[in-house]
Every structure is written in C-alpha cells, then in structure tokens.
UniProtKB/Swiss-Prot annotation:
Expressed in buds, stems, leaves and roots, and at lower levels in capsules. Localized to sieve elements of the phloem adjacent or proximal to laticifers. Homodimer. Forms heterodimer with SOMT2. The heterodimer SOMT2-6OMT possesses 3-O-acetyl-4'-O-demethylpapaveroxine 4'-O-methyltransferase activity, where SOMT2 is the catalytic subunit. S-adenosyl-L-methionine binds at M162, T166, G192, D215, D235, M236, K249. It comes from Papaver somniferum. This is (RS)-norcoclaurine 6-O-methyltransferase. Optimum temperature is 37-41 degrees Celsius. Optimum pH is 6.0-9.0. Induction: Up-regulated upon fungal elicitor treatment or wounding. Substrate binds at D165, C250, I251, L252, H253, D254, D302. The keyword Methyltransferase applies. Pathway: Alkaloid biosynthesis; (S)-reticuline biosynthesis; (S)-reticuline from (S)-norcoclaurine: step 1/4. Keywords: Alkaloid metabolism, Methyltransferase, S-adenosyl-L-methionine, Transferase. The active site is at H253.
C-alpha cells in the first residue's frame, strides 16, 4: 500500500485549507452576529461555556455542544483563548476589532463583505475573462452603482463598511500625515465622501480647513448633517467643486485606467496653482513582505469583480498621473492597507 509522504500531506493540507477558506470568514461573521466578543468583554472575567451560552443575545436555551464547537474553531483561529485549567474563555488580542462602538471596530466590514449578495460576485470570478460585463452585474443583474441606488438596506450596509475602513485610515492619517493637510490648505473637497466619516475626522484634526463632501445624489441624501461641513451632490466625471485640495479615499480603485484619467483631469480643472489631489488607495508591491501584502491582492480581485476597477502598483499610478497631465506625485506608506499619494497638477 502506497503511503503519502510528509510533503504530499502538506500539499494536500494546503489545498484542503483553501477549499474551506470560506469557513473562517463565515465563522468570523457568526461570532460577530452572536456578539461573542462583546459578551466576554462586558463580563470582564473569563467565562465558562455555560456562562457564555446563558449571556448570548439569542433564544435560550443554547445548544452548548454546537457553541463549544464554534468556540473551539474560534480559539484555533486565535481570536479567543481558553484556559487549559479552568476551561474558561477570554478575548485574544485580535478580538478587540470585533467589539462594536469604538473607532477601530471592524464589525461593519465583516458583516458587509460576508453578506450573501456581496459574496455572490466571487462565484463569477472566471466569467469576467470574456465579455465586458462585471461579475457583480452577472451575479445580481445590475451594476454595483445601480444596485446600491435601488437597495437602501444594502447601501447602508455598504456605507457602514466604507465608514469602518475610513475610520481605520483616518486614524493613521491624523497621527502620521499632519503635514499633508497643514501645508497651505484652506479648502478641501472629499470626492466620493460617502457619509462623511473621513472629512469629519479631517475637519476635527484641522479645524481651519473648510471641508465639503461631494458625492452622488442618493449618497448625499442618506448622509448625515455634520457641523461646518458642506454637502454637494454631482458627478465627478463631469465636474468637481474647486478647492485647494481634493481628497479621494478608495475612489480611483473603483475605475479602469481611462476612467481614472478622466477623473484626474476633472481634478486638475478644479485645482488652483499649488493645489493637490490627496489620494488614499492601495499601492501593490509584489516584493513586499508586509502583513497587508496579500490583502492588497485580495482587494484587487474584489475591485475587478465589483466595479471593473483595480488596485495599482507605483508604476501604474505614475502612468495615470502622466496621462492626466500631472507634474509630479509622492507616495507615502502609512500604518493602513492603503498608502497616501499626493498628486500635483502644476
């Protein structure tokens, strides 16, 4: 009888892990929906399985055998810990990002990305190799932009996830990139500013800057009123309000190269001499060993599936700026998945 070598076992194990790669995402979503992290956090002290089961915000009684198996998997994912002696559960360090109500919570991103509709395009990954239809449209019958405009619940879920990511990024911006916003900027337009999470943080950190949110009408209609922030609806492909700085966080990655060049040209038209575009977007580096290196590649596929856009390398960014007639640009890495790119048209 032929035996399987250790190397073959490792190779098979790698494929099995990838076959069930979805499991970690959906177990993570389950943990958020069950509020396991909040329950353990609010209890302060570690909890036994029975104690945890009795406090979960679900119909009682809880099937403790099934909860045990979910917790066993979550412990293996290193999100929670179990004491070998007391058999009581507590939070592992990454679990703090599963807690709601603080600026670095990742709960909204977890719920959105693992929503069945937003997962559906991934089942059409190969379909995009032929034809011009994006996987999102194949899966859900509409482009992502039309879909959002006619599905308010999904639009809110999506906006909450974008705000979640923006809070992570703006925390890094405020701490690491003050000079970018304090260098002769008195007015700033956040193009594609959504619900205003980014511009609110910018305005708080730099109160002398007059800030404006610019987005599509249905987005502006759902965005909250923010003190000292102006809201304008419109189409960035047609025009952009004038300002000393134009801020775009995760906007250009939604679009193909020709569309990005068009947007950048509208930016150039809106900027005075000395003005700049502040772009917060992924910069792919295939030689990087950074912890975010793989997620940046995942986001590239996500853009390909959902919008027909892409994440770009430094060389690809330079090509866009050159084609749009920009004079220079500078890339700054920050402690986030995205980098900051300052692009100067003059």
């Amino acid at each position: 009888m032929e035996t399987v070598s250790k190397i073959d076992q490792q190779n098979q194990a790698k494929i099995w892990k990838q076959i069930y790669g979805f499991a970690e995402s959906l177990v993570l979503k389950c943990a958020v929906q069950l509020e396991i992290a909040e329950t353990l956090h609010n209890n302060v002290k570690p909890m036994s399985l029975s104690e945890l089961a009795s406090k979960l915000p679900v119909a009682q009684p809880v099937n403790e055998d099934r909860l045990f198996r979910i917790m066993r998997y979550l412990v293996h994912m290193e999100l929670f810990k179990i004491d070998a002696t007391t058999q009581k559960y507590s939070l592992a360090p990454p679990a703090k990002y599963l807690l709601r109500g603080w600026e670095k919570s990742m709960v909204d991103s977890i719920l959105c990305i693992n929503d069945k509709d937003f997962l559906a395009p991934w089942h059409h990954l190969g379909d995009g190799l032929t034809g011009n239809c994006d996987a999102f449209e194949k899966a859900l019958g509409k482009s992502i932009w039309v879909y959002m405009s006619v599905n308010p619940e999904k639009n809110q879920l999506f906006n909450a996830a974008m705000a979640c990511d923006t809070r992570l990024v703006t925390s890094a911006l405020a701490n690491e990139c003050k000079s970018i916003f304090s260098d002769g900027i008195s007015t700033l337009v956040d193009v594609g500013g959504g619900t205003g999470t980014a511009v609110k943080a910018i305005s708080k950190a730099f109160p002398d800057i007059k800030c404006t949110i610019y987005d599509l009408p249905h987005v502006i209609a759902d965005s909250p009123e923010i003190p000292n922030i102006t809201k304008i609806s419109g189409d960035m492909f047609k025009s952009i309000p004038s300002a000393d700085a134009i801020f775009m966080k995760c906007i250009l990655h939604d679009w193909n190269d020709d569309e990005c060049i068009q947007i950048l040209k509208r930016c150039k038209e809106a900027l005075p001499k000395g003005g700049k575009v502040i772009i917060v977007d992924v910069v792919i580096d295939m030689d990087s060993t950074h912890p975010y290196a793989k997620i940046r590649l995942t986001l590239d596929l996500d853009m390909m599936l959902n919008t027909g856009g892409k994440e770009r390398t430094k060389e690809e960014w330079k090509t866009l700026f050159d084609a749009a007639g920009f004079a220079s640009h500078k890339v700054t890495q920050i402690s986030a998945v995205q980098s900051v790119i300052e692009a100067y048209p003059y």
